[in-house]
């Protein structure tokens, strides 16, 4: 099965400038941070992405209806940010590297069609230190994002970033997007709501900065 995009609804309002992705990972930090944008704003499900392993990760509704796990793409507006954003959420990460690439490419193709300019992926940053205070790290794809991130107090990170967060951010540069990957410090507690809230807040500030630039 190839990756497949199911269009649910078209966008009738202002086109989004920024796309955000959050999938399950360390401390569930990324998905919960991205979910805050959807739950706290006015969100509309516009598309669903299916990959091969969607059929083996099933969801059963309260009425007993079984359906494959899809990756949902939301169009979100809010008084908290200047322009609408696109948010990708999913209930799992494929353990197959090829499928992870397919998901990333499909999402980025969709973002390209919608003329998105910035793509930010979210995740957790494993730390063993006592977390009296938390840092949020960024690996930016462009100079503008780097400059704005430093102003927002984000720390620069280096090294290997695994999973969907690293893959989507890494590929997005080759699709011509600005942005990068943001990672909040966590000790791996599930869920780490403190890390997710901090990550959400830092990205919100950054989104408003890039929207105004």
Kindly give the residue locations of the regions a language model identified.
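N-terminal short beta-loop-beta anion/metal-coordinating cradle
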Residues: 1-91
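Gly/Ser/Thr-rich loops at beta-strand to alpha-helix junctions
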Residues: 23-29, 94-95, 124-129, 188-190
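Short, glycine/acidic-rich beta->alpha junctions
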Residues: 29, 99-103, 164
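Short, solvent-exposed amphipathic alpha-helical segments in soluble enzyme
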Residues: 34-39, 104-106, 197-200
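Hydrophobic/aromatic beta-strand patches that form the interior of the parallel beta-sheet core
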Residues: 86-88, 118-120, 178-183
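Secondary-structure boundary elements
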Residues: 108-119, 173-178, 205-211
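Catalytic cores of processing enzymes, dominated by hydrolases/peptidases
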Residues: 127-206
């Amino acid at each position: 099965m190839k990756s497949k995009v199911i269009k649910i609804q078209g966008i009738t309002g202002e086109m989004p400038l920024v796309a955000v992705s959050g999938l399950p990972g360390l401390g569930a930090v990324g998905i919960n941070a991205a979910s805050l944008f959807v739950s706290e704003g006015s969100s509309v499900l516009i598309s669903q992405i299916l990959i091969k392993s969607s059929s083996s990760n099933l969801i059963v509704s309260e009425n007993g209806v079984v359906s494959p796990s899809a990756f949902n793409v939301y169009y979100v507006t809010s008084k908290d940010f200047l322009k609408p954003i696109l948010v990708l959420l999913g209930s799992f990460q494929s353990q197959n590297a090829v499928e992870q690439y397919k998901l990333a490419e499909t999402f980025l193709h969709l973002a390209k069609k919608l003329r998105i300019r910035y793509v930010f992926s979210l995740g957790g940053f494993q730390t063993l230190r006592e977390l009296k205070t938390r840092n949020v790290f960024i690996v930016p794809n462009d100079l503008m994002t780097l400059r704005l991130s430093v102003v927002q107090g984000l720390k620069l990170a280096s090294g290997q970033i695994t999973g969907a967060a690293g893959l989507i951010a890494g590929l997005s540069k080759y699709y011509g997007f600005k942005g990068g990957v943001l990672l909040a410090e966590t000790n791996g507690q599930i869920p780490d709501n403190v890390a997710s809230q901090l990550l959400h807040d830092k990205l919100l500030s950054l989104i408003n900065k890039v929207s105004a630039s």
